[in-house]
Amino acid sequence: MIFSQGASPLKGDFTRIKFSIASPESILAHSRGEVLKPETINYRTFKPERDGLMCEKIFGPTKDWECYCGKYKRVRYKGIICDRCGVEVTTKSVRRERMGHISLAVPVVHTWFFRSVPSKIGALLDLSTKELERIIYYEVYVVINPGEPGEKQGIKKLDRLTEEQYFQIITEYEDNQDLEDSDPQKFVAKMGGEAIHMLLKNLDLDGSAVLLRKILKESSSEQKRADALKRLKVVEAFRKSYEPQRKVRKKSTGLFPEDDIPEPYIYEGNKPEYMVMEAIPVIPPELRPLVPLEGGRFATSDLNDLYRRVIIRNNRLKKLIDIRAPEVILRNEKRMLQEAVDALFDNSRKANAVKTGESNRPLKSLSDALKGKQGRFRQNLLGKRVDYSGRSVIVVGPELKLHECGLPKSMAIELFQPFVIRRLVERGIAKSVKSAKKLIDKKDPIVWDVLEKVIDGRPVLLNRAPTLHRLGIQAFQPTLIEGKAIQIHPLVCTAFNADFDGDQMAVHVPLSQEAQLEASLLMLSSHNLILPQSGKPVTVPSQDMVLGMYYLTKSRPGSLGEAGIFYSREDVLIAHNEGRLGLHAQIFVQYDGRLDQKFDSLRALDWILEAGTEKYEWLKKQLEKKTMLLTTVGRVIFNESVPEEIGFINRVIDKKVAKELIGRLSSEVGNVETARFLDNIKQVGFHYAMKGGLSVGLSDAIVPETKAKHIKAAQRDSTRVVKEYNRGTLTDNERYNQIVDVWQKTSNIVAEESYQKLKKDREGFNPLYMMLDSGARGSREQVRQLTGMRGLIARPQKSMSGQPGEIIENPIISNLKEGLTVLEYFISTHGARKGLSDTSLKTADAGYLTRRLHDVAQDVIVTMDDCGTTRGLFIQRNIEEETSGQIKFREKIKGRVAARDIYDTITGNVIVPAGETITEELAEIIQDTPGVEEAEIRSVLTCESKIGICSRCYGTNLSVHKLVEIGEAVGVIAAQSIGEPGTQLTLRTFHQGGTAQGGISETETKAFNEGTVEFEDIKTVYHAAINEDGVEEQHTIVIQKNGKINIVDAESGKVLKRYVVPHGAHLAVAPGDQVKKDQVLFSSEPNSTQIIAEINGTVKFADIEKGVTYKEEVDPQTGFAQHTIINWRSKLRATETREPRLMIIDASGEVQKTYPVPIKSNLYVEDGQKVVPGDIMAKVPRNLDRVGGDITAGLPKVTELFEARIPTDPAIVTEIDGYVSFGSQRRSSKEIKVKNDFGEEKVYYVQVGKHVLANEGDEVKAGEPLTDGAVSPQDILRIQGPNAVQQYLVNEIQKVYQINAGVEINDKHLEVIVRQMLQKVRVEEPGDTELLPGDLIDRSVFLEANENVSEKVRISERGDAPPRIQDDQLHRLREITKLNRDLRKNEKQLIAFEPALQATSHPVLLGITSAALQTESVISAASFQETTKVLTDAAVAGKVDHLAGLKENVIVGKLIPAGTGLKKYKAIRLGGEAIEASDAAAAAAEAEAQARREAMDE
C-alpha cells in the first residue's frame, strides 16, 4: 500500500501483519474526529458540511494547501490549523487515509462475529444463533447476574426472559434494584448489544477452556464432544491472541506521525467484548466518493447511504434517551440502530437487505467492497492499471529478427514522451518542456531522430490476454514503423497463442534500470525458446515456414542434373543458381564436416549402378569413407543456415524434425545461435513456400478406388451381425457394439488407403499430402473426411459433466469431396455445432481451474539448495505405457537428481551416482540399458524443507536445462504449466466436426514385438465347440482374472511387454512359443464379462425366479426369449431377500461350484442343462464408453482429481491382504469378508446389484478393488499411505493430458500441486501439546508442536519439590533432573515424572480449493474465496501473516519473495570495489542461513 509522504502511517520495512479485532480505544486512536451529522455536501456551495460525512475538519482539505474558509492558501502555511474553520492546511490526498468515527448511543454487536458459521459469540456464550438473534434484536432479556431473586425463582445466568417475566421479577423485588451493580446479590438482566457486551466482559476464558477440555476427555456422548470441540477452538483462539495490556511507547507505534499519537493509545490482544462496538470507524471520504454528474446531480457510493442511516438513527436515539422516551420506543430505535450497523458492515447476509430507491438493488456494504472479483483484494490490489502502456491490433512482421517487434511511431512517441522531451531539452533543441511538447505535437522530423535514439536498447514488454503462462508476456526491442498496428515475429505466435485475425496486444514500458535489465536478460523473446511445462521448444516454425522447408528438402526422381558429382557446397549453389540443377535433384557432394546421425536413404546410387559400374564402385567407397555425401540440392541450401556444431542435416525437414533440431541446438549451442538459426530458417521457409507455389485444388483430394469394395464388405458384416441378433445369439447391446466396431474398422482402413494414395500421387508432391506430411496444416483425420469417409458421428448429449454421447450406428459413407446427402449433412451439423458451443463454455472452466491451481501453489518457492532428505521416489520402467505411446521412462527421470546410485543390475556398473543430476544423455543411456528396471530419484513429494522446497528435490529448470536456482517460483510455473493446456482439454469436443473417434473394441490382442511367451497366474480349461460351418473347434479358455502373458527376450530373459488377459479370453499361444510381431496372442469379448463353467455337471438355478429375480423379454424382431436378471427388491417384502446364483451339481446332486449372477446379466443356460468346462452360462454387459477414454473425460476428470472428490460410485477396496469369502445377504446389501493368515478379518457391505470382481477363495492384496467402480483417492491414502496416493494422482492426471489432448506436462509440475494437497494433517490425540483434537494444521506446525514437548516431562508426583512445581504440570527434563539431584543430596523425596505425550495425527488429502483456503497466509486466503469468513477467523485468532507467499506481498505492495526479491539478496551490499566471487557466494550462503533462521524464529 502506498501512502503519501505527508503522514506515512505504514513504514515500508514491516515483515509481517497481525490481524485482530479493533478495540474501542484503537478505533478512537485512528479517528480524527467524530462525525455528528448525516449531511455530505451543501446543496448550494457544493462544499462539505461541517461535522458531516465529508467534513474537511475531520478528513482534511478538498483542495491542496487550502483550508475550508480560504483564510490560508499556498504551501507556505503547511501544517497550520486554521483558527476559523479548524481545517489543517495540507494536501488533499490525506482524505484517502484519515478516518473518523461515530460514537454510538448504545453498544452494537458486530454482525461478522455473530452471523459467521459457527457463530463466534455463540460459541463463547454457548448460545445458538437463533437465541442470540432474539437477544441482540431486543426481543428477550438475558440474565447477566441472577442475584438473590434469581436464586429464589430458580433462574440461572444466561436464561432468557420475556418482558412479562422480567417486569414481574423487578416489581416483586423492588428493593433489589437499589443495590450497587457490582453487588453479587443484585438481579441484572439486559437485552441487545449492551447485554452481550456485559456477558462477554465477564467471561472467564481460562475456566471455560479447562471445562471444555474436561468434557472432551471424559464425555461419552459424541455430540457433546463435537460441540465442546467447536467451542474450545474459539475459546483457545481468544486465549492465544490476548496479550496483557501494555502501553506502547510513542516512538514504536509507527502508525501515526510522531506528534500525533493519541495519549490513551494502547496495544493489546483480543478481548471477547471487542466483538461489541461502542464506536464505529468511518472510512476516509475518498474511498466512498461523491462524484458530480452533468445536470447538477451527484453519484454517490452506497457506503454514504449506509453511514447516513446509522448517523440518523444514532442521533435520533440520543435525543430519545435525553428526553427519556418510553422503553418501547427506545427499544425499537435501538433495534433499528443495530440493523443499520449490520447493513453497513454486511448487507448481503441479511434476508431483508437495504435496497436503493430507484433500481431496487441491495446497497454495497463494507464486506461487499472486499469480496469477489470486483472487491478490493482482486480488483485493486492484485490487478492494477498501469501507465506507460498502450494497445493495438497485431500484424505479422516476417522481416523482423526474433528479438524485435514493430512499434507504430504514433504509439512510441506517446509512450516515450517524457524521455523524448528530456532529450530535446538536454540537446538544446527545445528551450522548455512546453516548447518540446509543441514540437512533438507538430510531429517535427527532428522528433523522430530523437525517438530513435531514445528507444535504442530500451526493451518494451508485449502481452496478449489471456496470459495463461509466463510466455504470454515477453520483451522485445522495438523498431519504429509507419501505420497503426504492432508487428510481431511469426515464431513467437505459438507462445502468445496469437493469430492475425484481429487479435490485439498491449505494450508496456519498463521504466527503472532494474526493470530494463530484467526485461533484457530474462524476458527477451530470444531467451524464451523452451516451454517451461515440458522442456520442449516453443518457437517452432509452423504453416508456410514448415511447408517451405519440407518442399525444399524433399527429393524428386528425374530432376535436372540428377546424380551429378560436386566438389563443394558452393559449386552446388552456383550450378543451381545458373539453372543447371533442379532443387529436388539427388547429387553427390564432397564433404568432410560433421554429419547428423539420422538420415534418409536416397536412391541415386542405384541409378548410377544402372548406368555403369566404375563410377558406382568409386562413389560407394567415398560414401563409406564419409568424404562424399549423397544428398539433394535443397538440403545443401538448407544446411547453409545450420550451425557447424550440429553437423549436416540430411533429412526431409518436417515440423517434428525442426522441433527436435531446435531442442538440440538450444541445449548444445545456446540461445544466441539458436535464435540466429530460427531467423534464417524463417526466411528460407517463407521463400521456398513462395517458390513452390503450393496451393490446394479439388483434384488434389483423391478418393481411393477400393473404397466401394470396403464399404460393401462392411455392409456384409453388419448384415451378418443383424442375422446373429435375429437368431438370438446376440443381445441388442452386443449387436450395437459389433456394428459400431465394423464401421470404425472400415473407416480406418479407407482412411489409411486414401492416405497411401495421396502419398504415391506425383511422387509425394501432391500439395495436400505435403501440407499434411510436413505438419504444416491439417491432420490425417481431416484427410479421412476429405477423401475417405466421414465415418461414425457421436450423438451430442445435453450433459455438462463431460460425458460423451453414444455413437450413431449408421455412418456417413460419403466424404466431403463427393458431397453429403441431406440426411448425412443434417447428422454432421449436429455434432459440429456441439463442438463450437462446447469450446466457448469450457474456456471459463479452464480459467477457473488455473486460478485455483495458482492459489494453492503460489507460495511454493525454491528456498534452499538441499534439504538433506534420504527419501526418494521410485520410478519404474512400465512396459505397457511405453508401448502405448505414453511418457517414456527416460522422460520421467530426465532432469532429476538421483536419490541413490542408479546402476546396471546385469553388469553392476554405476551409471549415475547418488546426488548427481540425470542429464539428457544419461537418461538416454539408462533407457537403453536393460539392466535398469527402476530408478530412485529426488522428488518434490519427498522434500523435507519446512518452507518452500529445495532445488535438488525439484531437479532442473526445464526452460534452461540447469538445476533450478534458489528463488524460482516453481509453484506458479507448475500452475501455469497445468492450466495453460487445460484449455485444450475440451469436454471432448468431438474432434473434426463432431466425428466420433476412438473406441474400437479390439477382439484380438497382437504381439507388439517378437519373443518367447511366458504365462503368469493363468488358469485355463479346454473347450470343444462346433462353429457355423459345422466344424469342431478346440479353444483354450482363461478362467482366472488378471492373468498375464509376458513376452520375454530369449537372450536376456527381460520382459519386453506384459499383457493382462481378461477372464474368458481364448488363448492362441502356449507357454514357450516363439511369437512374431503382430501375431495374435488371445481374443476376448470386449463388450461383456462372461460367467464360464469350470467343471462338468448340471446347472441348477438358485433364487432365479421368473418375474421376481429375472424377466423374460421376447425380441419383437427375432421372436427369441432373452432372460435378464433384474433388481428384485421392489418385488418382495422388507424381510425377504434373494441372491441369484448359478450352481453346478454333480451326478449325486452335490453342489460343486457356485457363481453369483449380478443384476443386468443375460442367462445363456436353462435350469437342469448339462455343461462342460468352457461353456458360457451368462454374460454381464459392460458399460463401454465408445468415445474414448474414461466416462468423465478431459477437464472435468482433471478437476475431479485435483479436487480429490470421491467418485459417484466408488469401488469398495480391501484394507488388508487375504482371501475372499461371501457372508450373509441382507435385503439391500451382501457381505464380503477378507481374512488373512493371522486371523484378522474385515467385513464389507456391498449394495445389491453392484458387480463383485472377486470370487470366493480369491487372494487379494490391500488396496485392490473388490467391486467395480473408480477407486477413491481417499481410500488409497487411508490404506496405502500418502506416497501411493501421490503417485496415483500424478499418474491419473498425466493420463488425461496424454491420452485426451496429447499434451506433454512434466511430472514435477503435477508433483508440486499434489504436494500442496497433502500439506495438512488432522490431529488425532493432542497428547501434552497445545493442539486440539481434530485440528487441521500444516505438517510443519505439527512437527514443531511435537518438538516443543519432546524435551518436557509431566509431573506425576511432586515429592518435596518447590511450590512452583505442581502435579500434572509440564516442565523441562533438564530442570527436573537438576532439582532431583538437589533433592537427592538433601535426602528428600524425589519428583516422579513421565515423558510428555506427543500428539498423533493422520495425513489429510485436500482438494485444491480447500487447500488454498487453508493456507497459512490470511491475506492470500482472503483474496481467494470466502473473504469475510477468513478475515473473521483471523481476527479472532489474532493471526499473523508472515508474508511468505507471492500474493500477499503483491497486495501489500512489496517485492515478491522470489527471484531477486529473496531475503538473501537484500542482505548483500556491494561496496566500492567488486566483491570476489567466493566472498559473494559466502555472503549469499550466510544470508540464506540467516533467512532460514529468521523464518524458523517467526
UniProtKB/Swiss-Prot annotation:
Nucleotide-binding listed as a keyword: no
CDD domains to which the protein is assigned, alphabetical: RNAP_beta'_C, RNAP_beta'_N
NCBIfam families: rpoC_TIGR (TIGR02386)
Reaction(s) catalysed (UniProt annotation): RNA(n) + a ribonucleoside 5'-triphosphate = RNA(n+1) + diphosphate
Names of required cofactors: Mg(2+); Zn(2+)
EC numbers for this chain: 2.7.7.6
Protein name (record): DNA-directed RNA polymerase subunit beta'
Keywords tagged on the record: DNA-directed RNA polymerase, Magnesium, Metal-binding, Nucleotidyltransferase, Transcription, Transferase, Zinc
Amino acids binding Zn(2+) 2: 867, 943, 950, 953
One BP term from GO: DNA-templated transcription
Group of enzyme by EC: transferase
Keyword Transmembrane helix in record: no
